[in-house]
Amino acid sequence: MNSIEFPLLDRTTQNSVISTTSNDLSNWSRLSSLWPLLYGTSCCFIEFASLIGSRFDFDRYGLVPRSSPRQADLILTAGTVTMKMAPSLVRLYEQMPEPKYVIAMGACTITGGMFSTDSYSTVRGVDKLIPVDVYLPGCPPKPEAVIDAITKLRKKISREIYEDRIRSQQENRCFTTNHKFHVGRSTHTGNYDQRLLYQSPSTSEIPLETFFKYKSSVSSPEFVN
């Protein structure tokens, strides 16, 4: 088990008296009492479930999974986050008491993963919704990597000052669920106009009249008994 060092903690005082600060005492009390809210949406969460077994035994870090955000101070996001799930994730984070922390686990959570190129319904990184403390890349990350991320989070907690963290979150809020969508052309008709096919959607938009004109010109398929 990795020990956490407190640089401001003085253990040389005689008569077994330890002098410290209120911030260090508060941080020390939270190191071994992280209660995570498990927000798993896809395959990355299966790797985190391995930590519950006796092989890795994440109870030695004081982790107690909670099902209510009001009783959790750590949310671990694992898997793809869609646009419809984004407001729910933000609401869960806002219901958690301060101080609260976030671990982003897996490529889909950090950048959108393989869905980040052509999917209109995937959030390109959970840090666009909530502030992230530790990024854990991988597809999926191994249980050993999850333990390392928790260890790094504990080291971060041991050195932070509560007032500075609250001030930083208030000045750098990144909650947003607003995305702009555009009407696109159908790609399953089997009949395309070459001008529309090679027209870059980033430089110009297809007028609605042109879109419905070419859509209605395609004949419906015929079925033969």
Curated annotation (Swiss-Prot):
Where is the major localization of this protein?
Answer: plastid
Reaction(s) the record says it catalyses: a plastoquinone + NADH + (n+1) H(+)(in) = a plastoquinol + NAD(+) + n H(+)(out); a plastoquinone + NADPH + (n+1) H(+)(in) = a plastoquinol + NADP(+) + n H(+)(out)
The protein's matches in SUPFAM superfamilies, at most eight in alphabetical order, are given as: HydA/Nqo6-like
The cofactor named in the record is: [4Fe-4S] cluster
Q: Read off the Pfam families from this record.
A: Oxidored_q6
Q: Does the keyword Translocase apply?
A: yes
Which subcellular locations apply to this protein? Plastid, Chloroplast thylakoid membrane
Question: Where, by residue number, does [4Fe-4S] cluster bind?
Answer: 43-44, 108, 139
Choose one Gene Ontology CC annotation of this protein and give it.
chloroplast thylakoid membrane
State if tRNA-binding is listed as a keyword.
no
Assembly, in brief, is: NDH is composed of at least 16 different subunits, 5 of which are encoded in the nucleus.
What is the recorded function of this protein according to its Swiss-Prot or TrEMBL entry? NDH shuttles electrons from NAD(P)H:plastoquinone, via FMN and iron-sulfur (Fe-S) centers, to quinones in the photosynthetic chain and possibly in a chloroplast respiratory chain. The immediate electron acceptor for the enzyme in this species is believed to be plastoquinone. Couples the redox reaction to proton translocation, and thus conserves the redox energy in a proton gradient.
Would you tell me the protein name for this molecule? Answer: NAD(P)H-quinone oxidoreductase subunit K, chloroplastic
